Amino acid sequence: MVRQAQEVHMVPPGIFREYDIRGVYGRDLTPEVAGRVARAFAAYLRRKAPDDRPLPVVVGHDNRASSAELHRAVVEALVDSGCAVVDVGLVTTPVFYFARVHLGVDGGVMVTASHNPPEYNGFKLAHGFGTLYGEDIQEVRRLAETGVTVRGEGSVRTADVIPAYRVALRDRVKLGPRRLRVVVDCGNGTASVVAPQVLRDLGVEVVELYCDSDPTFPHHHPDPVDPKNLQDLIRTVRVERADVGLGFDGDGDRIGVVDDQGRIVWGDELMILFWREILPKYPGAQAIVEVKCSQALVDEIRRLGGRPFFYKTGHSLIKAKMKEIGAVFTGEMSGHMFFADEYYGFDDAVYAAARLLRILSHTDRPLSALLADVPRYYATPEVRVPCPDDRKFAVVEALVRQFKERYEVVDVDGARVLFGDGWGLVRASNTQPVLVVRAEGTTPEALRRIQKVLEEALARFPEVGPVDWGAEVGASR
């Protein structure tokens, strides 16, 4: 039964982002707010349901200090709303996705803030094939604010799905004859409960680095897109003479890679390796590439016979687009890798690691040699520049207009400004109060010139913080 509350419930509107819900625990997110969001999500699911049977919903959480309490509030609210809850407990986000497929459950709530700082938390809401984003997220917000709820006698049962997940990956990914030595850095995040175990199941020798679950993240933040978080992994790979180093983010859906020489393999380079394995099986396949990627990736996809096209960044957006066009694989610079080839299409860093190890296990060549023929452009890392949430999209819209007066611009997601010898990007993050900035040039001089163009454009906006390009600027890719 659907009930319209008479009062308006105060739910912070800023927690509803483009493709998930995030906020500071204790300020934006409390158990009470979690309950309201969960009740609104149950009402959303009821509207989508074909009949009045109990709504099955999988609920999981990451290892953040506040996650277990928010998890309990979500489960309680869903049961009160007539949902048949399957509580999978402490899991990575990909294991949560797997649980929905494995158990045949449409609905899902994952309590996680991914790579945000420790004081944050949030929710990923799932229905059908993918996770909610855009207008669907906003519909849940409106339901929460207006107090629309459903009532019923729900239920809850627990399920340990990690053993089934381990079996699934072991059966799907068979390594070749080469014995691999791998350093695994979980950053004390949730991947600690599954990544080392899965890789050992595959027959890999694992050297563990920060693979104890600890929500304070005492050694470094579990965000492998930031080079400073990979420094211990780089050192350990060199000391251990490992074949590869693998880093995972806080909820296990993003991967960072370090080659045998201790060099960071950026997300677009990693995608080149995967496309070289995948595209020969799908001649002429469409290939989604995000606006942050290197021109080297675009050129390599074309060389392999694929059809690249630029699209927006964001895991929910990507998964929906993949389903729409029947894409077999794509990825993001941030380390999200989406395999529909031989897998389910969702982003799973541990599965991506297994696929990389399969490639390495079938060759005697080191990872550094496999990428030696990729054009060596000069690029910055992804740089996050502070900008208030309520201004970041307006700033980007203004920049798009300004850049178009002088340059060719790809504006599908921010402004990818095209120069004859490189490109520069400014886009608004959908999950943090920052602008994401990146640049690439065919020479160090071209890169520096493009960086200066971006710096000068951003400096016109007083609400935008300074651009700190970091130590990696000018490093050859």
Kindly give the residue locations of the regions a language model identified.
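Active-site nucleophile and cofactor-binding loops and adjacent substrate-binding regions
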Residues: 85-94, 264-267, 289-290, 311-312
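Gly/Ser/Thr-enriched, mixed-charge loops and adjacent short helices
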Residues: 121-240
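Phosphate-binding and adjacent anionic-ligand microenvironments
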Residues: 282-477
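N-terminal small/polar loop signature for handling phosphorylated ligands or for N-terminal nucleophile
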Residues: 47, 56-120, 197-258
